[in-house]
């Protein structure tokens, strides 16, 4: 028979709770494609990229419609990372055109550093070519320091000016900072820009 507790009796209920295993954390939304390769980006897949058949060169149109910046993927220094807000690749190449290929002159040789926001090629501002990229250093997830070498005088003199510039991803865009940023921006405005 069941009896009800009296006024001086206490009923104690014990609740057993099992802790569910924590759900695995997903990758951040920004790193939606952690397995992406640089070859999967617009640098290689853009319909504006001009492949050169029979060679390992890829031509990227410039802001001068008849010129192309030609580079070999085998001669590219890639620091592409689809899970970082800012990564880069240095392209070593030459100016030329679609019919004749590289110009083959000393003044046509150039470097371009292209930047990526996660797995997206940054095209605004457009990448600018310069005589040489002397060095690139990551200063943080959103900051990359580039030492740009500019041939400010004759081709025979080679690099005559050095610009140390911090390229920073801030507020949804790529900006330049540092003591040489204004001088670099002036030179970049006068050089060929890629239009990937």
Positions of predicted regions on the chain:
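Short, intrinsically disordered low-complexity segments
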Residues: 129-130, 148
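Solvent-exposed, non-transmembrane segments of extracytoplasmic/periplasmic domains
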Residues: 29-128
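Exposed, interaction-prone regions of secreted/extracellular proteins
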Residues: 125, 133-134
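Short, low-complexity, disordered segments immediately C-terminal to signal peptides
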Residues: 2-28
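Extracellularly exposed regions in secreted/surface proteins, prominently low-complexity, repeat-rich
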Residues: 135-196
């Amino acid at each position: 028979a069941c009896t009800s507790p009296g006024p001086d009796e206490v009923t104690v209920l014990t609740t057993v709770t099992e802790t569910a295993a924590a759900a695995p954390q997903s990758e951040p939304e920004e790193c939606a494609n952690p397995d992406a390769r640089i070859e999967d980006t617009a640098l290689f897949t853009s319909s504006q990229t001009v492949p050169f058949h029979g060679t390992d060169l890829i031509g990227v149109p410039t802001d001068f419609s008849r010129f192309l910046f030609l580079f070999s993927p085998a001669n590219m220094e890639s620091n592409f990372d689809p899970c970082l807000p800012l990564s880069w690749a240095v392209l070593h190449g030459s100016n030329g055109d679609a019919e004749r290929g590289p110009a083959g002159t000393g003044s046509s040789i150039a470097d371009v550093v292209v930047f990526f926001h996660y797995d997206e090629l940054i095209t605004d501002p457009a990448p600018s070519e310069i005589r040489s990229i002397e060095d690139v250093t990551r200063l943080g997830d959103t900051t990359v320091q580039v030492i740009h070498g500019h041939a400010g005088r004759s081709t025979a003199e080679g690099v005559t000016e050095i610009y140390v510039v911090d390229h920073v991803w801030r507020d949804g865009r790529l900006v330049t900072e540092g003591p040489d940023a204004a001088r670099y921006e002036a030179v970049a405005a006068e050089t060929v820009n890629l239009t990937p």
